Design a protein with these regions (language model features):
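N-terminal secretory signal peptides
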Residues: 1-2
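Pyridoxal 5′-phosphate
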Residues: 7-230
Length: 230
């Protein structure tokens, strides 16, 4: 899906949400026609988004690891749902939970541009990637490429598949100050062999904030017939 269409769909999804989400819906609606590159530098847009968060003012949090802190309207709605589930007890689990899950899947599918049957809703990114890593059809001697700067939980999961299936983990180190994108792409290219099955790569490295050239890495890997897990 094109990023511009994604933003438009996100606007429609936000508008359909309760009144408390009005601030975010308005921010997206006012800027939905702008390209991602223009929107990235639109301070007015990001100020509207920033106003939806209540964060500790003592420091600026630049790390995007651990868990995703929520905009205030979403946090309030999340707590409201938890209270309702706790209030209903087993009745909720045996009745309305499936309707709620199906409705959520349908809305996410509309946003992602796929069918609800293609979606699996997990608790977080770590669980999703763990399932994807562990669910590969691994054979002894298969190779996986990753960087030492990748998220720790993912590296731990690759240790498990190494111990369980005999997978060979090839770990590279991404330079903090590369000359250009090609230097990073070459690191992954040189690690590929006929036995390489998958490359794990972080779009943004959580410990440094460094953004990697994902499109270039993916294009290179696909030319070699290698899957990429971002």
């Amino acid at each position: 899906m094109e990023k511009r269409q994604f933003i438009k769909d996100l606007v429609l999804t936000s508008i359909a949400m309760p009144i408390g989400f009005g601030g975010m819906a308005k921010a997206f609606a006012n800027h939905s026609e702008k390209s991602p590159s223009v929107l990235a530098e639109d301070n007015a847009f990001w100020e509207q988004i920033r106003q939806q968060y209540i964060l500790k003012p003592d420091y600026i949090n630049l790390e995007n690891g651990y868990y995703n802190f929520l905009p205030q309207p979403i946090l309030e709605k999340y707590i409201e749902h938890i209270k309702e589930v706790n209030y209903q007890g087993s009745y909720y689990m045996r009745t309305v939970q499936w309707d709620n899950k199906n409705k959520a899947a349908a809305r996410l599918a509309a946003l992602a541009g796929c069918s609800a049957e293609e979606l699996i809703i997990t608790r977080n990114t770590t669980e999703s990637l763990d399932l994807a890593i562990g669910g590969q059809n691994w054979n002894a001697g298969d190779e996986a490429i990753m960087a030492e700067q990748d998220y720790g939980a993912m590296l731990d999961m690759f240790v498990q598949v190494k111990d369980r299936y005999g997978v060979v983990n090839k770990i590279i180190s991404v330079p903090n100050h590369p000359k250009d994108d090609e230097e990073i792409v070459d690191l992954y290219r040189k690690a590929i062999t006929p036995k390489t099955k998958v490359i794990l790569v972080s779009h943004m490295i959580n410990i440094s904030g460094q953004i990697l050239p994902i499109r270039k890495i993916c294009d290179m890997a696909h030319e070699h017939g290698v899957q990429v897990m971002v």
